[in-house]
């Protein structure tokens, strides 16, 4: 994540470039230090005391270290994510050193702001193919062979809707 990148990942990133590493590092930027209690980090623009400060750019640091291209994408936009991975693989095969930054606010912190609606299943369209279950979302289960979404757990990210081949899942706006 972004916090680990600032804490200890920059040195590893420098080593990848220095040693001509054949890999595509990804920084999962959720703008918080989730593993130790949701503190701010250098990518948030706030000090640990909550005062405004310089916001360090993950992308600018990666560029300064020698990565190119540096691709930024919303990880919940599956088409954009696939396009970024494809572009990064092509760049790597062309001798470049690509990297991907995925950016999406941490749901544990931004849940109320992010939750603008939940997904629901149109049972007439659902064919029980289980594509949505492969997403691994805890809100989705099967009842009578068809997908159902637990409204108390759904955060409205729409990843399930993006993978449904029958367009049986849609977002209900609040």
Spans of features found by a protein language model:
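Iron-sulfur cluster-binding cysteine motifs and their immediate structural context
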Residues: 127-148, 159-174
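Short, ordered loop/turn segments at secondary-structure junctions
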Residues: 28-31, 75, 104-105, 145, ...
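Residue-level marker of alpha-helix boundaries and capping positions
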Residues: 3-4, 49, 123, 148-151
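Thiamine diphosphate
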Residues: 1-99, 111-112
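Glycine/aspartate-rich loop-and-adjacent alpha/beta segment that forms the canonical ThDP
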Residues: 89-142
